[in-house]
Amino acid sequence: MKLLASSLKLPNGAILQNRIAKSAMSESMGTLQNAPTKNLIKAYEVWSKGGAGLLITGNVMIDSRALGEPRNVVVENRSNFKLLQDWAKSCEGTGTHIWPQLNLSLIHI
């Protein structure tokens, strides 16, 4: 238990507050226009308050022509910028890192 609770310095210099992480999963909680939803942002806020050191998001696509599945969040321009900022800030003050799982599904293009 002590090891799980101990901090971890990664080779890139990031320091995780502990060794507990939520791995990537495909939440499919974006809008039909592929923006983050308030429910998605709230989920990460709640998970961060659970004390994990790292939350890895589900699929964040970089091209709307190449979705992994419907309702993936897409980052290809600034149209969803405010909601993306809110999502990134959902872990503020908890010490939890949130890292996006960036994807490009070339098979769909």
Where are these regions (language model features)?
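N-terminal capping/small domains of soluble enzymes
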Residues: 1-103
